[in-house]
Structure formats: structure tokens, C-alpha cells
């Protein structure tokens, strides 16, 4: 996600850096050093946007530690501001959510093997041109990377409004021995059971309101 530059963001992030994850690019992040409750599972959202999804998950699931990953500094600032406001409104302290303002093509450079319990991919860039297919976050090499950093039998959830990207993702998963498809739908909002625990992203709300179908799949690591 890209937003216009907001002059207040840099100073705001510096002031609230305890909610940010620093990475020296030389060593992997030690997840046990990030949160007060070190024994809680860790869920990672890759491309967290303005923070609605991960903020509401963190509010709802205090027994889980969350990481929101986003490479655009302005977006991280907007997301963190939303998080702090939502928690403050409920008189809660943010203890189970941190933001990571960085990115690496190979997440194995950042996270140790089998260190993440669950991964969320929400409305990722579809990279519609065929020559850019390797940049799609559900391309086979990315699926292999996720399988490396996620724990045994860990879960990955993926939502998108882009039907072409969804079809592509299903094909990639079908050919990848590391993952088993356990749920899929091309119309999430017609699945009443699935909606019970659904937390929408900003894009999701926008597209659904406009009448666009929302695709979702869930895969499980096979080992």
C-alpha cells in the first residue's frame, strides 16, 4: 500500500519506537525479545496496510502476539496511530502487537525457521502482467519461504478481490508439496460460518461495499 507522504510520521514513529521492531539485517529477529509474554504464539501479517485487520485481531486475541509487516513508512505510521487510538479507547495497553517497517524478498533472512505460527496475506499486489508473476506473494518461491519460517502444521490465510490472482494462487498451492489446501471460497460473504470470525481489511470493506466478491483460502503446512 502507498500513501501520500505525511510529515508527522517520522517524528511519530520515533516517539513510539517501542511498538516497532528493529532489524540490523545481519541477524535474524529474536521473537522472544519482542513481547512481554514470550510463550504466546506469533502471527504475522505481510502487508498490513492501515492496520484495521491486525489491530482488531490484537484486541480480540490478547493471547496471541502479532507482527504487522509493511515496507512503507507512512503506512506504518498511519497503522500504528490507529492501533494506539483503538487500544486507548478501550483503556488497554498495547502489549501483543508490534510493527515491522522493513521488507526482504526472503523472509528467512528475517525470521528463524519454524518461528511463526500463522501468516496472513491480505489483498496483496496482484502483479497482473505475466512477466511479473514471480513477484506475486503466492508464487512458489514465496510459498517455500513461508513453509520455512512457519511452525509445523502452521496456517496461512489469504484474501483477495482479484479473481486472477486467486486462481493463480490455487495453481501454485496445488503444485507445492509443503502445503495442503483446507479451505477455499470465491465468495467469502456468502459463507455465514466463515464470516463469524472474519475481520475485514480496509480494502476488503471497500470492495465488498462496491459489490465485488472476496476470495479466501486457507492452507496448512504438511509437515
UniProtKB/Swiss-Prot annotation:
Which enzyme type, at the first EC level?
Answer: transferase
Alphabetical UniProt keywords: Methyltransferase, S-adenosyl-L-methionine, Transferase, tRNA processing
Which residue positions are annotated as catalytic?
125
Q: Which GO terms describe its molecular function?
A: tRNA (guanine(46)-N7)-methyltransferase activity
The question of whether Nucleotide-binding is a record keyword is answered with no
- Gene Ontology cellular component terms for the protein in this record: tRNA methyltransferase complex
Q: Could you tell me what reaction this enzyme catalyses? A: guanosine(46) in tRNA + S-adenosyl-L-methionine = N(7)-methylguanosine(46) in tRNA + S-adenosyl-L-homocysteine
PANTHER family given in the database record: 3-DEOXY-D-MANNO-OCTULOSONIC-ACID TRANSFERASE/TRNA GUANINE-N 7 - -METHYLTRANSFERASE, PENTACOTRIPEPTIDE-REPEAT REGION OF PRORP DOMAIN-CONTAINING PROTEIN
Q: What is the recorded name of this protein?
A: tRNA (guanine-N(7)-)-methyltransferase
The primary gene name is trmB
Amino acid at each position: 500500500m502507498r500513501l501520500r507522504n505525511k510529515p508527522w510520521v517520522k517524528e511519530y514513529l520515533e516517539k513510539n519506537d517501542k511498538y516497532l521492531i528493529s532489524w540490523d539485517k545481519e541477524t535474524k529477529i529474536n521473537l522472544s525479545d519482542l513481547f512481554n509474554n514470550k510463550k504466546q504464539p506469533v502471527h504475522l501479517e505481510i502487508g498490513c496496510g492501515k492496520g484495521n485487520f491486525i489491530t482488531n485481531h490484537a484486541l480480540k486475541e490478547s493471547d496471541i502476539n502479532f507482527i504487522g509487516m509493511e515496507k512503507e513508512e507512512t503506512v506504518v505510521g498511519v497503522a500504528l496511530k490507529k492501533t494506539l487510538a483503538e487500544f486507548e479507547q478501550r483503556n488497554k495497553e498495547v502489549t501483543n502487537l508490534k510493527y515491522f517497517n522493513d521488507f526482504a524478498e526472503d523472509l528467512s533472512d528475517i525470521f528463524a525457521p519454524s518461528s511463526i505460527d500463522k501468516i496472513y496475506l491480505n489483498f496483496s499486489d496482484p502483479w497482473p502482467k505475466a512477466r511479473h508473476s514471480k513477484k506475486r506473494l503466492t508464487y512458489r518461491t514465496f510459498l517455500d519461504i513461508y513453509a520455512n519460517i512457519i511452525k509445523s502444521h502452521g496456517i496461512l490465510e489469504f484474501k483477495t478481490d482479484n479473481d486472477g490472482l486467486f486462481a493463480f494462487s490455487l495453481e501454485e498451492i496445488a503444485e507445492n508439496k509443503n502445503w495442503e489446501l483446507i479451505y477455499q471460497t470465491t465468495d467469502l460473504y456468502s459463507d455465514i460460518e466463515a464470516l463469524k470470525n472474519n475481520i475485514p481489511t480496509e480494502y476488503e470493506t471497500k470492495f465488498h461495499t462496491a459489490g465485488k466478491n472476496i476470495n479466501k483460502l486457507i492452507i496448512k503446512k504438511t509437515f
